[in-house]
Amino acid sequence: MIKLECLQDPSPRKRRTKLLGRGPSSGHGKTSSRGHKGDCSRSGYKRRFGYEGGGVPLYRRVPTRGFSHKRFDKCVEEITTQRLNEIFDNGAEVSLEALKERKVIHRETSRVKVILKGALDKKLVWKDAAIVLSEGVKSLIEAV
């Protein structure tokens, strides 16, 4: 959430400082660019931080809390055939729960894609519909 006290002044541009009250030829003489009368012309006056001349300031234009789709996104992880070879025994059932128990995938993961890298020597039973096999892995399983 954006807070008023968290806002920072934008870094000043590298520009020559304005010399005020140094005669009419300077362009900033007499009233020192403050105009005639009013609060702004008096000494001791300072504009409030974030003030943009009466328009709606940035910290009020920007929504304080937005919406992120991250909570609802499906968490998909990739796992290689080489890693499956190391983890599972021959004839073992491969499911999301089995992968989570062995701490191969994160507990938030809702889908797994198996990618061909290395050989898959073992005959595995694919239990879960959430486990997607790449084309290379499918052809490798059919060959085994």
Curated annotation (Swiss-Prot):
Transmembrane domains' residue ranges: none
UniProt key word Ribonucleoprotein: yes
Disordered, as annotated region: 1-49
The UniProt record lists the keyword Disulfide bond: no
GO molecular function: rRNA binding; structural constituent of ribosome
UniProt cross-references to InterPro entries, sorted A to Z: Ribosomal_uL15, Ribosomal_uL15/eL18, Ribosomal_uL15/eL18_sf, Ribosomal_uL15_bac-type
A biological process from GO: translation
GO cellular component terms listed in the entry, alphabetical order: cytosolic large ribosomal subunit
Gene3D superfamilies from the UniProt entry: 3.100.10.10
Keyword annotations from UniProtKB, A to Z: Ribonucleoprotein, Ribosomal protein, RNA-binding, rRNA-binding
Disulfide bonds, paired cysteine numbers: none
Subunit structure as annotated in this protein's UniProt entry: Part of the 50S ribosomal subunit.
Function recorded in the entry: Binds to the 23S rRNA.
Family: Belongs to the universal ribosomal protein uL15 family.
PANTHER family cross-referenced by the UniProt entry: 50S RIBOSOMAL PROTEIN L15 (PTHR12934), LARGE RIBOSOMAL SUBUNIT PROTEIN UL15M (PTHR12934:SF11)
Name of protein: Large ribosomal subunit protein uL15
Organism whose genome encodes this protein: Chlamydia trachomatis serovar A (strain ATCC VR-571B / DSM 19440 / HAR-13)
Source species taxonomy: Bacteria, Pseudomonadati, Chlamydiota, Chlamydiia, Chlamydiales
